[in-house]
Amino acid sequence: DVIVDCTGENNVLDILQSTNFKRTHIIASVSVGLGAKRLYVTLMNGNTFNFNAFYNLISPYLQAEKVLYDDYDLPRNGIGCWHPTFPGRSDDIWIAAATSVKVIENYIISKSQKTLSLIYEQKESDGIFESYDVVEKRENG
């Protein structure tokens, strides 16, 4: 079984972390940063899950985003990427979604037992989009 969380809500991950599943599951948590210029992914395989290492990995990036988006009154209405007032474009969300599907699929195919956490950033050169690059990768277990 695969559980995919796209809420970007720590309380959802906390619920998953406090649950002791009877069967093995793969859990994928996928979220984007403000403006959808970064993608945060963590994947785990097991029946108990711990997101503390993931929180520690993404925390500096989230803090940096708050500084970049000081002009926004946070938290604000429409905080999710699904909302029309989210400060990111739909094509940025599509790129993040497509990347996430590929990462999740590769993780499942590999039958990995390790926790995999990734941070992607959009790369541009001279104002031209080039790619999504992995800027942080951690494997545990």
Predicted regions and their residues:
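Receiver (REC) domain switch-region micro-motif
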Residues: 3
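Glycine-rich phosphate/adenylate-binding loop
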Residues: 6-141
